[in-house]
Structure formats: C-alpha cells, structure tokens
A protein has these predicted regions:
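Extracytoplasmic gate region of multi-pass secondary transporters
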Residues: 38-94, 182
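Flexible cytoplasmic inter-helical loops of multi-pass small-molecule transporters
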Residues: 7-30, 224-229
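Small-residue (Gly/Pro/Ala) motifs that create kinks and tight helix-helix packing interfaces
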Residues: 1, 5, 62, 94, ...
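Intracellular juxtamembrane helix-capping segments at the cytosolic ends
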Residues: 144-159
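Structural signature of the two symmetry-related core transmembrane helices
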Residues: 106-121
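Symmetry-related core transmembrane helices of the 12-TM Major Facilitator Superfamily/SLC fold
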Residues: 1-7, 198-216
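Hydrophobic core of transmembrane alpha-helices in multi-pass small-molecule transporters
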Residues: 130-144
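A late C-terminal transmembrane helix in Major Facilitator Superfamily
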Residues: 158-195, 203
Length: 229
C-alpha cells in the first residue's frame, strides 16, 4: 500500500493556495522555541517512556515466558502478540473519542493509569489469567493516547505546518532512540544479574511519564502569567 501510494499518488493543490502559503525555513531560534515548549517536552517524554516499556516487553517477553514461566516459545509469542493486536482497536478508539470530546489531558491520564496498573502484571504475576488481562489492558494503554499525541501539537498557539513537522520529528527521534535502547538495557541487565525483572521494572517506571504528562499538561498549555513588578 505504501509503495503504491508513493508511485501513484499526486497532490491536489490549487495554484491560489500555493501563492498564499509560502514555505519559509525556520531559524534556529524558532526551532529551539518549538522543541523547548513545555507541552512538547511532555509529549516527547510521554511517548518515549511508553515505547521504552513497550519495546522491552515485545522483545523479551516470549523468552521470559519460556525461561521463567515454563511456556513454549510459540505460546509466549502468541501472548505477546496480543499487545499490538489490541493496539489496532485502541488507536481507532483513541482517534474517535477526542473527535467527540476534544483534545483533553484525560486521553493521557487514563492510558497512563492503565499502563501503571497493567505493566507490572505482565511479568510479576505467574497467574495466566492475570498475564492475559495485563497484556490486554497494557495494549489499550500503550496505543489509546497516540492520536491525541499527534494532534495536540497542531492546537498549540502559533503553530504552523513547519513547526508541527519539527515537533513530530522530535517525538519520533526520541522515541526511536528509546526503542533502540530498551531491548539492549533489559538484555544487559539480564546478563549481569541473571533476571529480566530489574530491566522490566526500570522500563515500566519510565512508562509512568505518560500519566505524569497528562497531569502536568493543563499547566503546560495554560502557564500561569508571572506577577507584575
């Protein structure tokens, strides 16, 4: 599908719109003001923390289930595969709900609470029912916030398409680094201490940034003006 779009898609742009919306390069000062905005920093931290845990679990849970919970690799892989499967429906819900209720911090707080509760259950509990329930809830929490994450930058004051692109690039860069780092971190911790659990816990705590971002977002979007002298 992506290859077909790349080869066949053609932009539909009116000549009048091209003349009225010139593309201007951003200065370093403008770029810095965009990426240092408190709301943008919260978005970056939230997505990076969630993906730190998500990538660690999807990379290592099958091996963990096999070595620690005495499951077959195929069963461990099936259980882990529920995470992205549930995410398909969660991200759709995450796109529909804000369109009805607006871009509200609750769409960070609620998924953040799901992640805080369900994350540890995927590896600390040996009960199969708890594991399945934790995987499903974690899958919802790890994807429900994504549409709001990508839409919120467009609602920030003074944003232009160029600035929104900078924000998205910043988010993707940091999140990509977290996705690269987390499996290495869990693997290194396992080699040193002989257990996956400490690495999973570290990555799980990092995912709490989503809940923290939801709590702090109202203040970042509406900063209190400094008192006059």
């Amino acid at each position: 599908g992506a290859l077909t779009w790349t080869l066949l898609a053609r932009p539909v742009v009116k000549a009048s719109s091209l003349a009225s919306t010139p593309v201007t390069a951003l200065t370093r000062k403008e770029i810095w003001s965009v990426i240092s905005h408190p709301a943008v920093l919260l978005l970056v931290a939230a997505d990076g923390g969630v993906l730190l845990q998500y990538t660690a679990l999807t990379s290592w849970l099958p091996t963990f289930f096999n070595e620690v919970r005495d499951m077959s690799l195929s069963r461990g892989g099936f259980i882990t595969g529920i995470l992205p499967f549930v995410g398909v429906f969660a991200v759709l819900a995450g796109g529909i709900l804000p369109s009805r209720f607006g871009l509200k911090p609750i769409f960070f707080v609620a998924p953040g609470m799901l992640i805080v509760v369900a994350g540890p259950g995927t590896f600390l509990s040996g009960n199969l029912i708890v594991i399945y329930a934790s995987i499903v809830v974690l899958g919802i929490g790890s994807w429900l916030y994504v549409p709001t994450l990508l839409s919120l930058p467009m609602a920030l004051p003074g944003m232009t398409p160029e600035k929104v692109g900078i924000v998205w690039g910043f988010i993707i860069t940091v999140s990509g680094f977290c996705m690269f780092l987390s499996p290495l971190l869990v693997g290194a911790v396992r080699d040193i201490w002989g257990s996956f659990t400490p690495g999973f816990i570290v990555c799980g705590v990092a995912a709490w940034t989503l809940l923290l971002a939801g709590i702090l977002m109202p203040r970042a979007l509406n900063p209190t003006p400094a008192p006059g002298r």
